[in-house]
Regions:
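Short, cysteine-centered beta-strand-loop-beta hairpins and adjacent loop/turn segments enriched
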Residues: 94-98
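Protruding loop/beta-arch "assembly-hinge" segments enriched in small, turn-prone residues
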Residues: 99-121
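Short, low-complexity, charged/polar segments at coil/turn and helix-coil boundaries
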Residues: 4-93
Length: 121
């Protein structure tokens, strides 16, 4: 074994670990946000859209009271280290809910999960 091959193996291992760590953090953040979304009909929770490189536009017809389907869709779209990941909810009332418009989530959805992730990382 050469020094070069040792370095290559190390770089692959570190790269994979870093990629998995970044992806895992993003999954926790996005999942927490989705599950913190207050539920009436499930439309708000079902309208979270994950994407890479650019925020998703428009809304969906998805309704997801449990949140599992929305999380599964988000997980499939999340990239690892070096990726720019977005989670957006384009429903017209999502911003109102984020800033105190719901008794179920008076502190919002995104902000509380962002703060939670910052404490962990």
């Amino acid at each position: 074994m050469s020094f070069e091959s040792d370095l290559e193996r190390f770089a692959r291992r570190v790269g994979k670990s870093l990629d998995e760590t970044c992806r895992g953090i993003t999954i926790k953040w996005f999942s927490g946000t989705i599950m913190s979304t207050p539920v009436d009909t499930g439309r708000l929770r079902g309208n979270w859209q994950a994407s890479q490189e650019a925020p998703a536009s428009g809304t969906t017809a998805d309704v997801d009271k449990a949140g599992n389907a929305t999380i599964a869709k988000a997980v499939r779209k999340i990239g690892g280290a070096g990726s720019v990941n977005y989670l957006v909810n384009n429903l017209d009332y999502a911003e109102k809910i984020e800033f105190g418009g719901s008794n179920q989530a008076p502190r919002g959805m995104v902000r509380i999960n962002h703060a939670r992730i910052l404490r962990i990382v």
